[in-house]
Curated annotation (Swiss-Prot):
CDD domains: QPRTase
GO molecular function, one term: nicotinate-nucleotide diphosphorylase (carboxylating) activity
Family designation: Belongs to the NadC/ModD family.
Residues found modified as Blocked amino end (Pro): P2
The EC number(s) this enzyme carries: 2.4.2.19
Protein name: Nicotinate-nucleotide pyrophosphorylase [carboxylating]
GO cellular component labels: cytoplasm
Pathway(s) of this molecule: Cofactor biosynthesis; NAD(+) biosynthesis; nicotinate D-ribonucleotide from quinolinate: step 1/1
Amino acid sequence: MPPRRYNPDDRRDALLERINLDIPAAVAQALREDLGGEVDAGNDITAQLLPADTQAHATVITREDGVFCGKRWVEEVFIQLAGDDVRLTWHVDDGDAIHANQTVFELNGPARVLLTGERTALNFVQTLSGVASEVRRYVGLLAGTQTQLLDTRKTLPGLRTALKYAVLCGGGANHRLGLTDAFLIKENHIIASGSVRQAVEKAFWLHPDVPVEVEVENLDELDDALKAGADIIMLDNFNTDQMREAVKRVNGQARLEVSGNVTAETLREFAETGVDFISVGALTKHVRALDLSMRFC
């Protein structure tokens, strides 16, 4: 019987709801960085080299294979700059595999606006597509196992929900969104609370329907967390023999998450121990942007 407090769909639903609020704010902040602190396409002095009434058609092409992500951010960039004056034609959707030299979308509208929004739009789509592409690679390495890939809170400041959305597009799943939707009890929480049991019992009392996860560093701490009734137990820097022993001891009474020393080389080995989740901070912390470019036609 799965732990009663944990529903893996809750985090996805919460993210998709919150992101509707976050996208306009994130785009506005990015545009203000380019436009002297305000969202005004007229502040782009280089774009003023073109006549105001010049119309243009542009294409955005990927230079390498990957997974596309960022459609709504691109749309929001041009909505904020020019309302409905820019028309976007999409050839892909978020989560689609893309291939080198493929046209992913086209733009038609005022040339000044296309140039002003180019870098901001590409910054979002290259970053998010880069994350989605790496996640898809990791998910492929887990094929045939029962282990699910999770992200973490190790995200670029200001882009938490965007990066976690990219993880979903790549086929991964979300760990907690922040500090309000799940308990994650670590060493210092335990010391301050007095014991694992006291910390877990207090968490259940405060928020009975919120999942409680406990991080452990050895098998004795695992036993304590299990006896306390933790929903999820995070195995921090366990070796594979310890992971197998943890799976045996828990025997389905809680879910097990592996964290620490996870790379593309170790991922499969860790999954084959039988753990439920592997969380990888590098997915949203060490971001390699996918190579896309915009060209006027």
